[in-house]
C-alpha cells in the first residue's frame, strides 16, 4: 500500500501582551462582572516582555531550537529559569512581536476593516519589509490613516499600552460581523498565514505545488445567515500565494488537528490531491485564560502568546515518514467516556489492526500542553496524565509489567511545551520533530492522538478523539519498485485498452 507522508511542519508563536488584557476571555469577563477587581489592577504587572517570551524554554522547543529531550533535562518550573538565551527564529518557525503582528493583520485584511495610525505604520513598516518579504505584493495595503475618526462599534488595537489602530465592524446590524468577531477572525487568519509561510521557508516548498488546504482552528467566520460558513483555508491560501489551491475548514475543538491530518492524508492517499496543507492560527480569547491563578501565585501570565502551525502532507517520496491511513483510532458514539474505553479506542484498537503491541510504538504525541501553565492553575500535568493512562492500558493488556509503568512513560512520553491554545497543543506540536526522529533519528513508529471536549458547544455531552500511526519510510514506493511510475502504468493500460478497442472494431 502506498501511504502519504509528512513533508514538513511550521510553527509560530505571537507575543501579544496587550491582547491578554483587552481580548482574552478571562480579563474581558472580569471587566464586565467585576470592573474594579484587584486582578485587573494587578495583571499588567505580571506580563512578560518579548525578550522574556523568546528566552522561555518551552517556546524555544515549539519553534525547534531545542528538542523535547533537551527540555526534559531542565528542572521545573521552567518559568524560573532566567539564564537561557533564546532566538526569534528557529528550525520550524519564529516568535513574532506584537507590533509586526498588528501590521500583518492589516495586510491580511481583505475589506479595509483594519485602521492603523500613520505613526505606527511608519515605525513598523521597515520590520515587515525585512521579515516578511514573501508578502511584498500586499505591502501597499499597509498604510496609515487618521484613527481618531472612529465609528461607534470598533475593537481597539493596542501596542505598549497605546491605541495604535482599530478594527471596524463589517456590517451595521449583523452580530457575526461586528468588530469583535472580525478582530478574532483576523487574528486567526494572520497567524495562520505566518504559520504557512514558515513551513514554506523551512522546507523550501514551492507554494504552487500545494493544491488543497484544510484549516482546523477553533474560530468560525460567516455572517448572520451562516455563522460558520467559512472559509479560513482559502483566505489563508490567497495571502500566502497558493495559487493552485482551494480548501475548506474543519472543526472539532481540540481534536480538530488530528481529524485534519487524517482527512488530508486520505485526500492524498486516494489521489484526489497531491499536496495538502493543514493549517491553523491562534485564539485570542484563550490569552491569559488561567491568568487569575498565575497572578494569585505571583507568577507571570504564562498564556501570553498566540500559537499557529502548518503541516504539509504529500505523496510517498520514499524518504519522509509514512502516515498509516489503515491504522486510525477513533472514539465512536458508542464507545463510552471512561479512561479505559477512550484509550482503548484511540491507542489499542488501531494497533490491534496490525497485530502491534503498545510497546511497538516508540513515541506518543498527545495533548502537549505546557505543564508550567496547567500545574500552576490546578489542572496538573496533562501530557503526563495521558501517558499514565496509556501505560496502565499497556499493563492491562500484558504488553508491560506493572513495575515497568514509570520506565514506559519515560521512554515513550514527551514533556509538554505548547501553549494552551486549545487545538494548538493537540498532537501536532511533535510533527516537526517526528519527521527528524523517523528519518535521521532512532525512532521507527509514532502515534499522534487528538482529543476534544464537545460539550463546550452545548450540542452533545459526548467526548471526541482520533489517532493515527506514523512509521519510518522503508524507501519503497508502490509502482516504482521495478523502475516504472504510476503515470507510466496508466499510459500502458490506456494503450492496451486502445489496442483492444481497435481489434474489436476490426473484427
Language model segments and positions:
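Conserved catalytic cysteine-centered active-site region
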Residues: 162-183, 223-263, 267-274, 320, ...
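Conserved beta-ketoacyl condensing-enzyme motif
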Residues: 189-247, 251-252, 357-388, 393
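Structural signature of cysteine-dependent C-C bond-forming condensing enzymes
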Residues: 202-211, 241-246, 270-277, 353-359, ...
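Acidic, glycine-rich active-site loops and adjacent beta-strand->loop/helix elements
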Residues: 216-221, 252-257, 280-286, 450-455
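Flexible, glycine-rich active-site loops centered on histidine and acidic residues
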Residues: 270-305
Amino acid at each position: 500500500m502506498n501511504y502519504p507522508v509528512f513533508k514538513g511542519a511550521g510553527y509560530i508563536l505571537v507575543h501579544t501582551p496587550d491582547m491578554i488584557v483587552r481580548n482574552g476571555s478571562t480579563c474581558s469577563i472580569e471587566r464586565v462582572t467585576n470592573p474594579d477587581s484587584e486582578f485587573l489592577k494587578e495583571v499588567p504587572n505580571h506580563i512578560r516582555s518579548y525578550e522574556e517570551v523568546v528566552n522561555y524554554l518551552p517556546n524555544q522547543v515549539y519553534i525547534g531550537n531545542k528538542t523535547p529531550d533537551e527540555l526534559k533535562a531542565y528542572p521545573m518550573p521552567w518559568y524560573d529559569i532566567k539564564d537561557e538565551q533564546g532566538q526569534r527564529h528557529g528550525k520550524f518557525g519564529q516568535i513574532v512581536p506584537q507590533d509586526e503582528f498588528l501590521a500583518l493583520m492589516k495586510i491580511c485584511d481583505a475589506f479595509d476593516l483594519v485602521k492603523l495610525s500613520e505613526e505606527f505604520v511608519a515605525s513598523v513598516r521597515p520590520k515587515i519589509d525585512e521579515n516578511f518579504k514573501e508578502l511584498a505584493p500586499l505591502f501597499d495595503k499597509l498604510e496609515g490613516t487618521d484613527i481618531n475618526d472612529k465609528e461607534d462599534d470598533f475593537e481597539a488595537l493596542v501596542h505598549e499600552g497605546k491605541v495604535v489602530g482599530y478594527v471596524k465592524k463589517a456590517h451595521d446590524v449583523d452580530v457575526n460581523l461586528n468588530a469583535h468577531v472580525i478582530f478574532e477572525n483576523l487574528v486567526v487568519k494572520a497567524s495562520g498565514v505566518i504559520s504557512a509561510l514558515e513551513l514554506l521557508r523551512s522546507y523550501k516548498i514551492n507554494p504552487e505545488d500545494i493544491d488543497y488546504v484544510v484549516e482546523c482552528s477553533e474560530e468560525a467566520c460567516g455572517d448572520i445567515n451562516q455563522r460558520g460558513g467559512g472559509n479560513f483555508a482559502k483566505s489563508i491560501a490567497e495571502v500566502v500565494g497558493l495559487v493552485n489551491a482551494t480548501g475548506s475548514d474543519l472543526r472539532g475543538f481540540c481534536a480538530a488537528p488530528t481529524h485534519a491530518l487524517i482527512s488530508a492524508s486520505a485526500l492524498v492517499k486516494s489521489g484526489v490531491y497531491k499536496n495538502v496543507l493543514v493549517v491553523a492560527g491562534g485564539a485570542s480569547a484563550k490569552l491569559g485564560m488561567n491568568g487569575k491563578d498565575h497572578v494569585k501565585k505571583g507568577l507571570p501570565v504564562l498564556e501570553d502568546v498566540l500559537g499557529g502551525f502548518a503541516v504539509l502532507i504529500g505523496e510517498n517520496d520514499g524518504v519522509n515518514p509514512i502516515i498509516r491511513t489503515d491504522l486510525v483510532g477513533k472514539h465512536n458514539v458508542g464507545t463510552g467516556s471512561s479512561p479505559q474505553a477512550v484509550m482503548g479506542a484511540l491507542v489499542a484498537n488501531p494497533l490491534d489492526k496490525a497485530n502491534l503491541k503498545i510497546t511497538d510504538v516508540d513515541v506518543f504525541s498527545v495533548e502537549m500542553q505546557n505543564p508550567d501553565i496547567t500545574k500552576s492553575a490546578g489542572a496538573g500535568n496533562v501530557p503526563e496524565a495521558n501517558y499514565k493512562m496509556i501505560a496502565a492500558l499497556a499493563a492491562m493488556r500484558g504488553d508491560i509489567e506493572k513495575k515497568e509503568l514509570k520506565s514506559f512513560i519515560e521512554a515513550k512520553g514527551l514533556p509538554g511545551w505548547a501553549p494552551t491554545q486549545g487545538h494548538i497543543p493537540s498532537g501536532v506540536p511533535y510533527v516537526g520533530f517526528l519527521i527528524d526522529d523517523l528519518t535521521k533519528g532512532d525512532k521507527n513508529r509514532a502515534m499522534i492522538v487528538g482529543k476534544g471536549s464537545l460539550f463546550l458547544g452545548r450540542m452533545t455531552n459526548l467526548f471526541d478523539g482520533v489517532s493515527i500511526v506514523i512509521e519510518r519510510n522503508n524507501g519503497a514506493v508502490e509502482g516504482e519498485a521495478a523502475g516504472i511510475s504510476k503515470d507510466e502504468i496508466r499510459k500502458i493500460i490506456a494503450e492496451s485498452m486502445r489496442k483492444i478497442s481497435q481489434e474489436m472494431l476490426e473484427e
